A protein has these predicted regions:
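Short alpha-helical segments that sit at the start of domains
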Residues: 1-8, 65-91
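Short Lys/Arg-rich amphipathic alpha-helical segments
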Residues: 1-44
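Phosphate-centric recognition/catalysis
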Residues: 2-3, 153-193
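Short amphipathic alpha-helical interface segments
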Residues: 8-12, 16, 83-103
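Short acidic, hydrophobic short linear motifs in intrinsically disordered regions
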Residues: 18-26, 100-111
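Short amphipathic alpha-helical interaction segments
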Residues: 33-41, 112-126, 139-142, 173
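A short, conserved structural fragment
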Residues: 46-57, 128-137
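Minor-groove-contacting beta-hairpin "wing" of winged helix-turn-helix DNA-binding domains
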Residues: 56-57, 62-66, 137-148
């Protein structure tokens, strides 16, 4: 039996992403030459799956087979479980943690301009998408939140570099030239005094 078929069988049976280390252990492979065969087999499987309803993707914890997004409505009919609906506040909180980690609840509140409800943080922790990394060394020692590998896996990302890029904010002076005059005037006045 060829290694590609064995890897595909493992991926089909797995209920989690499988890493190269997992493949080496399960296939009882120890040499670097055989490890390159694993990588080559994965590459070939990825090519084969390009024209199928599922694909082989690399996520933070390894590789997994998943149904392509365009089939999600059909697949959803198999389960009666309704998908988790996240509130705007929950999505904003998760986004802030993903983009600006590690952050405290206070940091999130400063950015959002409103209080973060306890149930929002609890939901994100219960889903396994965020965790406490440590505590900021300030009075009160607030918890520092970061995203987890489960967050990356559930949102089909290999790492946080896969997050969409945030739009760059324009320079305020480009928006209003009067601001440049005011800033320049203030600077001159300060130097003269």
């Amino acid at each position: 039996m060829d290694i590609k078929s064995r890897i595909e069988a493992l991926l089909l049976a797995a209920n989690r992403p499988l890493s190269i280390i997992d493949f080496k252990e399960m296939l009882e492979i120890s040499s670097e030459e055989e490890e390159s065969e694993i990588l080559n087999a994965i590459f070939n499987l990825q090519k084969e799956y390009e024209n199928r309803p599922s694909n082989l993707v690399e996520v933070s914890n390894g590789y997994r087979l998943q149904i392509k997004q365009e089939f999600s409505e059909d697949i959803a009919k198999l389960w009666e479980i309704k998908p988790l609906r996240l509130s705007k506040a929950t999505l904003e909180t998760l986004s802030i943690i993903a983009y600006m980690h590690p952050v405290t609840r206070g940091d999130i509140e400063d950015i959002r301009g409103v209080n973060v409800a306890t149930n929002v943080v609890k939901l994100l922790i219960d889903q396994g998408w965020i965790k406490i990394k440590g505590y900021r060394d300030v009075p009160g020692r607030p918890a520092l939140f970061i995203t987890t590998n489960k967050f990356l896996d559930d949102f089909s990302m290999k790492d946080l570099d896969d997050l969409p890029k945030l739009p760059e904010l324009p320079d305020p002076i480009d928006i209003s030239p009067e601001l440049a005059l005011e800033v320049k005037t203030d600077q001159v006045d300060e130097k003269e005094v």
